[in-house]
Amino acid sequence: HEDTKTTNEEYNRNLGLEYNYFSADNLWNGKLMYLKSFSPGSTDDDAIFAGNLTYNDNNFLGRVQTEYVGENYNAEVGYAPRTHYYKFDTSLRYLFFPSQDSKILSHGPLFGSNQYFNFDGVGIDRGTQLGYEVNFKNRSEMVLTFENQFIVLQNPFDPIRTGIQSLGALTEHRWNSINLAYDSKPQSLFTYALESSYGGYFQDGKRWLFFSEMGYRFQPYVELNALVSYSHIELEEPWGTNGFWLLGVKSNFTFTRNIFYSNLYQYNEQQKLWNFNSRFQWRYKPASDIFLVFNSSDTRMLTPNRNWNLTLKINFWINL
């Protein structure tokens, strides 16, 4: 028998600052954010810097956003899907307002672009979107978009995430797609949203997506929603043709003007996972909140598991 002594030196902390700007005429708003992570053995390139600036009047909206994520940035509690990149986004929209007797409130073109670069300035991901939106007077809306996607895989990637085979790192993939979305008027007790897209996919494949969300409000305390999503993917062998469902239910409870409780429970057929998210919110002062959030995921439904986290977040609004 040999006695051993162990020490737990694993930790992860994040410290940051956020500045929000709103102009007196409400035409301009922006944000600057800096976050630094602290973990054992990490001393440099472990921070995030991000900022955005938006101009919005009755007709024109323009927005630019940039972010930098260091190679060693780590957020054990939170979500940072990738590191080691620069990102630059642009959004433009112009609205026309027809005559008073029209059922359409506004309509107009929109443009969006997002670009990722590595630290050598080489483009690794690029997405471009061109579309047209229609907003009706009953507050329902419809959007038609065309998208072009370019991706350089930074790591091996399984396009259907079932473990059959992975595409190689640094391979390039391009495709186009068309997307149509409709949201019903939000003031109704019964609401719904529909979205469908068709186009290319990795490895010169094809993908068709359908999403639907239906909800009903029991005024003024409860809102229940059901979500259904289906993905149909066609690829060459060995992947072949596959279809995957994503099913979920949401519930939102309003106990008082300042206390809220929401839940999301869903099953992801592609990853064979049950996911549960529960969030309690207390607005203790205007624009100031306390959030308590529980997340878990498991391969079996309604079973205790070790893959869960509990997060406490406190926001305090200061007027300067």
What feature does the model see in each segment?
Residues H1-A24:
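Hydrophobic, small-residue-rich alpha-helical packing segments that form membrane-like cores
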Residues E10-N12, D25-L320:
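Exposed, low-structure sequence patches enriched in small/polar residues
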